[in-house]
């Protein structure tokens, strides 16, 4: 099994939309963001689809919201990895934080791994809805079936009510103010145009977001190259890339870390001392010139 997939493998260049389509098509879900798969439940079911019967799906919690609930799903996944002798390390602490880059990378690996097993062909005999034993969607379906059954039994016990064939009285026409129709039509057109403009704006923003996201992803892939992993500049870039909070001091910390690694702080201090000495010499020379005059 292709468990060792290098960072420069084509698998890590698969886009976010393709990953989401892969998940939604196979598991009959409706995910719109990569972060929604941070609980680990989706990954467990993908493994269950690829290796039927290996994953204890009754232990997988699709409603996990807290980190401790998500960690339980990753424990199930780790047990499956052990059974299948998969050597891929699970960075649970990063994945449960819901960071898009970390979760996208893991899902890219998972897709590449599953495709290497089944050739990218969907298992037509697999019913993902039935296999999910704890999902909220399945609960709602069960509830609706119970309601329909109760309605059927009630209809069996109660005879149908006879309907009258008498013609109904004339309905009173709703009165509209003069010009009301034209005003409402103009409002509808204005609102429709506003909606279209907003859709265009959202589309442009999504494209811009995806563009910068792909750039960040390229930088991350480059930084994770083993030959570059320990370089001071790469360590500084990772510090900024993996910062969880929008903290302005992150850049300063990264610069300080880089300066320490390169030994630039000593040079800066020496430069300051030299400048101070030069200033003192200039002041002494100026004072000596004044005394001579």
Swiss-Prot record:
Q: Where is the EB1 C-terminal domain?
A: 180-250
Answer whether the UniProt record assigns the keyword Cell cycle to this protein: yes
Q: What are the protein's GO molecular function terms? A: microtubule binding
Q: Where is the composition biased (Acidic residues)?
A: 266-285
Mind telling me which InterPro entries this protein's record contains? CH_dom, CH_dom_sf, EB1_C, EB1_C_sf, MAPRE
Q: Where is the composition biased (Polar residues)?
A: 151-166
Spell out the Basic and acidic residues composition-biased ranges: 129-141
Q: Describe the task this protein carries out.
A: Binds to the plus end of microtubules and regulates the dynamics of the microtubule cytoskeleton. May be involved in anchoring microtubules to their nucleation sites and/or functioning as a reservoir for distribution to the growing end. In plants, microtubule minus ends are not necessarily severed from the nucleation site and transported to the plus end of a microtubule as part of the recycling process. May play a role in endomembrane organization during polarized growth of plant cells.
The entry assigns this protein to a family as follows: Belongs to the MAPRE family.
The identity of this protein, by name, is: Microtubule-associated protein RP/EB family member 1B
Name the species this protein comes from: Arabidopsis thaliana (Mouse-ear cress)
- Name of encoding gene: EB1B
